Amino acid sequence: MKVHRMPKGVVLVGKAWEIRAKLKEYGRTFQYVKDWISKP
């Protein structure tokens, strides 16, 4: 599972179940993708 933060978005690389789990995990912390990519 790899997570690449780009200036305008996020690229998730992995199996479908890994990506769904990671999105749920980040969904608890960040409400919007904008918040996720602006975080240092």
Curated annotation (Swiss-Prot):
GO terms for biological process: sporulation resulting in formation of a cellular spore. Highly effective in inhibiting polymerization at low and intermediate concentrations of GTP and only partially effective at high GTP concentrations. Keywords: Sporulation. Induction: Expression is regulated by the mother cell-specific factor sigma E. Pfam families: MciZ (PF13072). Interacts with FtsZ. Binds to the C-terminal polymerization interface of FtsZ. Binds to FtsZ filaments. This is Cell division inhibitor MciZ.
